[in-house]
C-alpha cells in the first residue's frame, strides 16, 4: 500500500491527541511501521518558533488577522516541504495534528476572513497537495473549551469567545459536508466510543486503499 497523509482536525478539547495515538496504533496493527507524526503549527525549528509567536504573541502588540494567517501558512509550508513530502517520498505514512483545513475553519470561519483570500493563498503555496484522509472530531464548543480549561492555561487563540468557536465549528461542518476525504466523528461521546468509531472508520478506509488481488 502506498504511503498516505492522514490528518486529525477539531476544536480545542475534541481529543485530537488521543485520536492520533489511536490512528498510529491502527496503522501498526496493519503492518505499517514507518509512521511520522507532525503537528501544526510546528514540526520544524522554524515552524516551532512561529508556533510560539502565533499562540503567545509578542508582549502587548496585537496580532492582526492577516499576520496570523501568513505566519500559519509560513509554518505549514516549511513543514510540508521539509518533513511531510520527504517522508511520503521515502514510503512513510504521515499522521498530522491539523493541516490547512484549520486555517479555513479558524481564520475563515472564526475570524470571518475572505474565503477567496484563503483559497488564493492556499493554492499559491500548497497547490494540489492535500491529505488523503481527514478525521474531523466534531464537538460542541462549550464542551470542548471546558475540557481544554481543565488541562491548564489557555493560549491566545483558546481564550477567544464562544461565538468565535461556534463559527469555527460551523465552517468545519460545512467543509466536511463538501469533502469526500473528510470523515466526521462525534467527539462529544465518551473516549471509548470515539476510539471505537475512529478505529472502525479508519480500518474501513484502509481496506478500500488496499490494491485489488
From Swiss-Prot:
The keyword Repeat does not apply. ATP binds at residues 10-17. The gene is tmk. The keyword Nuclease does not apply. Belongs to the thymidylate kinase family. Its EC number is 2.7.4.9. Transmembrane segments: none annotated. Keywords: ATP-binding, Kinase, Nucleotide biosynthesis, Nucleotide-binding, Transferase. GO terms for cellular component: cytosol. It catalyses: dTMP + ATP = dTDP + ADP. One of its GO terms (molecular function) is ATP binding. It comes from Sodalis glossinidius (strain morsitans). Phosphorylation of dTMP to form dTDP in both de novo and salvage pathways of dTTP synthesis. InterPro entries: P-loop_NTPase, Thymidylate_kin-like_dom, Thymidylate_kin_CS, Thymidylate_kinase. NCBIfam families: DTMP_kinase. GO terms for biological process: dTDP biosynthetic process; dTTP biosynthetic process; dUDP biosynthetic process. This is Thymidylate kinase.
Amino acid at each position: 500500500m502506498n504511503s498516505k497523509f492522514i490528518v486529525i482536525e477539531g476544536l480545542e478539547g475534541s481529543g485530537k491527541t488521543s485520536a492520533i495515538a489511536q490512528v498510529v496504533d491502527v496503522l501498526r496493527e496493519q503492518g505499517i511501521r514507518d509512521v511520522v507524526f507532525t503537528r501544526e503549527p510546528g514540526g520544524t525549528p522554524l515552524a516551532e518558533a512561529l508556533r510560539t509567536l502565533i499562540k503567545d504573541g509578542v508582549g502587548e502588540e496585537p496580532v492582526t488577522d492577516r499576520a496570523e494567517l501568513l505566519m500559519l501558512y509560513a509554518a505549514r509550508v516549511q513543514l510540508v516541504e521539509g518533513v511531510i513530502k520527504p517522508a511520503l517520498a521515502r514510503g512513510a505514512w504521515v499522521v498530522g495534528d491539523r493541516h490547512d483545513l484549520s486555517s479555513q475553519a479558524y481564520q475563515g470561519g472564526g475570524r470571518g476572513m475572505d474565503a477567496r483570500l484563503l483559497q488564493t493563498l492556499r493554492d499559491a503555496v500548497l497547490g494540489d497537495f492535500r491529505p488523503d484522509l481527514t478525521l474531523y472530531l466534531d464537538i460542541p464548543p462549550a464542551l470542548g473549551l471546558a475540557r481544554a480549561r481543565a488541562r491548564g492555561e489557555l493560549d491566545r487563540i483558546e481564550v477567544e469567545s464562544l461565538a468565535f468557536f461556534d463559527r469555527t465549528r460551523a465552517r468545519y461542518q460545512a467543509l466536511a459536508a463538501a469533502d469526500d476525504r473528510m470523515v466526521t466523528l462525534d467527539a462529544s461521546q465518551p473516549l471509548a466510543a470515539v476510539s471505537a468509531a475512529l478505529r472502525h472508520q479508519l480500518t474501513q478506509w484502509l481496506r478500500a486503499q488496499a490494491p485489488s488481488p
